[in-house]
Amino acid sequence: MSSSQNNNSSWIDWFLGIKGNQFLCRVPTDYVQDTFNQMGLEYFSEILDVILKPVIDSSSGLLYGDEKKWYGMIHARYIRAERGLIAMHRKYMRGDFGSCPNISCDRQNTLPVGLSAVWGKSTVKIHCPRCKSNFHPKSDTQLDGAMFGPSFPDIFFSLLPNLTSPLDDPRT
């Protein structure tokens, strides 16, 4: 990142640009700033200031240490909202999350999933809607699974049922 970018880029820009964070979508500033979406999150006023202000020194990374967790938990909420589902739908359709390694699934696009909604329990996995299995992603990511949660694929496909594979339909 050049110094001119540092002065115009927020912590969110810096964080999303880190290799391995490509599963995340950008949570809009208005969503992040909405106090309803911050309910239950600790230190929100201090962390909000950090993640929305321009990054002075990208090498400083996490100033308090909780920014990644805080953004991840806001992200988990956002991807369940309409705008977040639309953003994740675009990424899903492009195949940004990878494809199922199971040969019988014929390179089915996958979705990110967390095995727990609790921070620090596991890293993100990919979920195949065809075989209903979870796998380690091929991409080099160490994102916490709580950034997506265990129910995200179920919510995604229940709200976008036309994306489920015909093989999932018991009538076929």
UniProtKB/Swiss-Prot annotation:
Give the source lineage, highest ranks first.
Eukaryota, Metazoa, Ecdysozoa, Arthropoda, Hexapoda
**PANTHER family reported in the protein's UniProt record:** CASEIN KINASE II SUBUNIT BETA (PTHR11740:SF0)
**Tissue-specific expression:** Probably not expressed in wild-type flies. In males lacking the Y chromosome, it is testis-specific and constitutes the main component of star-shaped crystals.
Q: Which family does it belong to?
A: Belongs to the casein kinase 2 subunit beta family.
Specify the protein name: Stellate protein CG33247
What does this protein do, in the record's words? Unknown. In males lacking the Y chromosome, its strong overexpression leads to the appearance of proteinaceous star-shaped crystals in the primary spermatocytes causing meiotic drive, possibly by interfering with normal casein kinase 2 activity.
What other facts are recorded? There are multiple copies of the stellate gene in fruit fly, encoding proteins that are extremely similar, which makes their individual characterization difficult. Thus, most experiments probably do not discriminate between the different members.
GO terms of molecular function: protein kinase regulator activity
What SMART domains does the record point to?
Answer: CK_II_beta
What Gene3D superfamilies does the record tag this protein with?
2.20.25.20, protein kinase ck2 holoenzyme, chain C, domain 1 (1.10.1820.10)
According to the record's subunit comment, the protein's assembly and interactions are: Interacts in vitro with the casein kinase 2 alpha subunit (CkII-alpha). The relevance of such interaction is however unclear in vivo.
Q: Which PROSITE patterns match?
A: CK2_BETA
InterPro entries (alphabetical): Casein_kin_II_reg-sub_N, Casein_kinase_II_beta-like, Casein_kinase_II_reg-sub
Copy out the induction comment: In wild-type flies, it is strongly down-regulated by double-stranded RNA (dsRNA) interference mediated by Su(Ste) transcripts. In males lacking the Y chromosome, the absence of Su(Ste) locus, relieves such down-regulation, explaining why it is strongly expressed.
Which SUPFAM superfamilies does its entry note?
A: Casein kinase II beta subunit
Give any Gene Ontology cellular component: nucleus
Which Pfam families does UniProt cross-reference here?
A: CK_II_beta (PF01214)
